[in-house]
Amino acid sequence: MNFKPRWLATGIGSLPVLDPEEAVSLILEYLPEIPIWPQLPQRGPVEGMVWQYSEGMPRIRSDVKSNKIWIDAAGDLTPELERFYEHFFAGNAEYFALSREFAPGYYAMVNRLKSALPKEIRVLKGHITG
């Protein structure tokens, strides 16, 4: 790959808008060479990066009403860990996919790019929580 960014603009992901389609339009207008997929935390806690990556993880519990997320270490961890690793070792990537409920901005961007990939795009930027 012969990509030389040369000070091209990109973003961190979070945008202060509620509508996923509006977010995608703003991103493609202002970050045309290195667009991000939008996270829209003003829509609610599940749009936050920690919440998005907690979905499907063993022993992670959450309560949207109180905006809390935690690890439940009580009881036998084995069944949830087995289920998690069965999917992992089977290569079942769909099990680990972001859901439309937790990441509508991601799906809005994917759908827009599938319908018409702008020629200005050099790289797509994603985000992970580590």
PLM regions: where:
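Active-site-proximal loop/short-helix segments
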Residues: 125-130
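Alpha/beta catalytic barrel-like cores
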Residues: 1-124
